Amino acid sequence: MLTATAQKKHRVAIDFERPSLGNLDLRCGANLLITLAGKIAKKAIYFLTLWQQFFIAMNGQGKLYFRYGTMGSAKTALLLTQAYNFEERKMQYLCMKPIIDNRENANVIRSRIGIERACSWIYPEMDLYEFLKSEFERTLEVKAWVLVVEAQFRTKEQVDQLARVVDDYGVNVVCYGLRTDFQSHVFEGSLRLFELADTIDEIKSTCSCGRKTIINARIDSNGDVVSDGNQVEIGGDDKYVALCRRCWRARRIESAERNALQFHDSHSE
């Protein structure tokens, strides 16, 4: 038998262990406050991003750049040098390249001289405006510079999306790419960049004859200039050579005559 004092202590212990309705209300209230605080924080981040977007857009500092040149004109090296300078100055930037350029088999941009930087992939059907908007919201900061390599492979719509990023966020978007393909026809992305870019710069390089290169000639395994084929065929020095217009025309004629002679010889035997 418990004494009266022991029974009283036992009842107090039981009451202490048993959660009261008041304690449950406090716990539920705390959980509700935590959930509510999380939602408020998300809204605050969203409106902060919108305010940052509005403030930057009002300043109107962003520009769309198109820097074009033939293959081997150091376009990629210039982009990577620009990225290095941003890092030195603690400036925010983002590098991007098309998934079609899989020569490195990795999400890096690498130049012929060996320097490289990590980058984000650009897929054929990607909405670049929505991607960059999500990237800015995810990192809680608007990148001051977006650097795009192989910009000639972008669609007309994607170039429009990049221009919208410039206008809405005040971001500087710098596109590096080719002007024309191996048949001297302007790429879709390049044409749209010529139409929309605020600043257009030519990166010049020299043909073996001393003139300025303007044609990205495609060559076969024998070094002959190719005149037919798909517009897009990824390759380096083994498939392309930058030529001036005169040398390109001369080599096309030489290649055509040589191929015609070989065809004639093979059928006359």
What are the functions of these language-model segments?
Residues 1-14, 38:
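Ser/Thr-rich, low-complexity intrinsically disordered segments
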Residues 10, 18, 52-54:
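Cationic, low-complexity basic patches in intrinsically disordered or flexible, solvent-exposed regions
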Residues 16, 46-47, 54-55:
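Aromatic (phenylalanine/tyrosine) cluster motif
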Residues 36-37, 41-44:
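Cationic, amphipathic, low-complexity segments that mediate targeting or membrane/lipid association
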Residues 141-154:
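Conserved P-loop NTPase "ATPase switch" module shared by AAA+ and STAND
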